[in-house]
């Protein structure tokens, strides 16, 4: 009995058994040969469906013989009436060929509804430079020979939108997007069209569709567009004229308001100029200067403006003092005491509103008169003048 044919005994649970093969080199060589030099196996030994080993009956499943992509030529069909699935994913399924329209089923006739919704624009002629052609599957597209573009969109729809008064600016930005979408969906068609433009323009006249030839009404489209442009220019001109009229009326209204404000001012223009030259405040308007220099009540003048009036019942205002009561001989004594070079120019440079208030205080300590330089006989008339100013019956200061 060959010990190699005896099956090895199962090891007890929990124990591992190590087998040592005698011909290890032979087994490794067989493994390398099976990997490096594989032998071809039969297709029958592989798990494949039964339809894989059957030859096709005909070529009806090819792309060229499908119903909606044959371009109107009757191709062979299957007994079950199955159509190619690839053709339904393309835009060619939206419109059938000329030869398949009569014998189409109700489901195929329903696919024509999307095309018939745009039949209103078929009566209008194409714009200048445009041409409508059809693909091999019956899908129509439009060529612009002026701008060298190809699009699925009908340019007559954009022209109808431009003729509408509410839509003066048609959506022309959809042309590049539609051109890109057409180039992505059917690149062979775009390349074929570019090749036809480079080779010979006479190939465009070989199409058998009746709308390729420009109709007689195509020559009237520039006149219609010119009329529409004239209407737009008239509307724009009317808007400009209305705006100019509103500006003119506004200017007249401003002039009337200015004249009314000038009539409401209580003082004349010459008086205002004189006061402005004398006072010359940097940030006062004419109406504020008139109220400031006028001693009457500003509300009696009838002016529409209200400003801050000067105080007439306190010592803080500028108009609360009376006529200066300094005697003439006192002023002459002051002129004799001033021995500076610019003594005569000092009263001219000082603001009159600042020198009129402290008239009798010039002889007191802390003023511009030095009492140490005066003699005793000179001080007596000064004190008398101060007493006469303080003992007046009509006081010029009102204490609150």
Swiss-Prot record:
Biased composition (Low complexity): 91-110
Example GO BP: positive regulation of protein localization to nucleus
Localisation: Cytoplasm; Nucleus; Cell membrane; Cell junction, Tight junction
CC terms in the record's Gene Ontology section: bicellular tight junction; cytosol; nuclear body; nucleus; plasma membrane; tight junction; transcription regulator complex
Region (Disordered): 52-117, 192-216
Alphabetized GO MF terms: protein homodimerization activity; transcription coactivator activity; transcription corepressor activity
Region annotation (Required for interaction with PALS1) ranges: 222-400
Entries under Gene3D superfamilies matching the protein: 2.20.70.10, 6.20.430.10
Domain WW: 124-157
SMART domains linked: WW (SM00456)
Keywords associated with the record: Activator, Cell junction, Cell membrane, Cytoplasm, Isopeptide bond, Membrane, Nucleus, Phosphoprotein, Tight junction, Ubl conjugation
Functional summary from the UniProt entry: Transcriptional coactivator which acts as a downstream regulatory target in the Hippo signaling pathway that plays a pivotal role in organ size control and tumor suppression by restricting proliferation and promoting apoptosis. The core of this pathway is composed of a kinase cascade wherein STK3/MST2 and STK4/MST1, in complex with its regulatory protein SAV1, phosphorylates and activates LATS1/2 in complex with its regulatory protein MOB1, which in turn phosphorylates and inactivates YAP1 oncoprotein and WWTR1/TAZ. WWTR1 enhances PAX8 and NKX2-1/TTF1-dependent gene activation.
Full protein name: WW domain-containing transcription regulator protein 1
Organism: Canis lupus familiaris (Dog)
């Amino acid at each position: 009995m060959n010990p190699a044919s005896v099956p090895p005994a199962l090891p007890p649970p929990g124990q591992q058994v190590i087998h040592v093969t005698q011909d290890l080199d032979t087994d490794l060589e067989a493994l390398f040969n099976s990997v490096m030099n594989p032998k071809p196996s039969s297709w029958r030994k592989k798990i494949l469906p039964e339809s894989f080993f059957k030859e096709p009956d005909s070529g009806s499943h090819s792309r060229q013989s499908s119903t909606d992509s044959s371009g109107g030529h009757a191709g062979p069909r299957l007994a079950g009436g199955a159509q190619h699935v690839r053709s339904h994913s393309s835009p060619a399924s939206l419109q059938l060929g000329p030869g398949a329209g009569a014998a189409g089923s109700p489901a195929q006739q329903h696919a024509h509804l999307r095309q018939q919704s745009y039949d209103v624009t078929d009566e209008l002629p194409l714009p200048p430079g445009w041409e409508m052609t059809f693909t091999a599957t019956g899908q129509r597209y439009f060529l612009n020979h002026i701008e060298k573009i190809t699009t699925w969109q009908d340019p007559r729809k954009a022209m109808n939108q431009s003729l509408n008064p509410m839509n003066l600016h048609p959506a022309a930005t959809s042309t590049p997007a539609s051109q890109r979408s057409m180039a992505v969906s059917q690149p062979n068609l775009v390349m074929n069209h570019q090749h036809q433009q480079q080779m010979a323009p006479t190939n465009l006249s070989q199409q058998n569709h009746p709308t390729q030839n420009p109709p007689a009404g195509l020559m009237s489209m520039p006149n219609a567009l010119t009329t529409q442009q004239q209407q737009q220019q008239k509307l724009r001109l009317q808007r400009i004229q209305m705006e100019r009229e509103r500006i003119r009326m506004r200017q007249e209204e401003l002039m009337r308001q200015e004249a009314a404000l000038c009539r409401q001012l209580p003082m004349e223009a010459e008086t205002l100029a004189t006061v402005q030259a004398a006072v010359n405040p940097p940030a006062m308007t004419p109406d504020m200067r008139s109220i400031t220099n006028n001693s009457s009540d500003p509300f009696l003048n009838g002016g529409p403006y209200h400003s801050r009036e000067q105080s007439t019942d306190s010592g803080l205002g500028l108009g609360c003092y009376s006529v200066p009561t300094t005697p003439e001989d006192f002023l002459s004594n002051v002129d004799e005491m001033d021995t500076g070079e610019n003594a005569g120019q000092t009263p001219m440079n000082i603001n009159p509103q600042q020198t009129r208030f402290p008239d009798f205080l010039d002889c007191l300590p802390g003023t511009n008169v030095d009492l140490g330089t005066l003699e005793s006989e000179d001080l007596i008339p000064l004190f008398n003048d101060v007493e006469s100013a303080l003992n007046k019956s009509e006081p010029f200061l009102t204490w609150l």
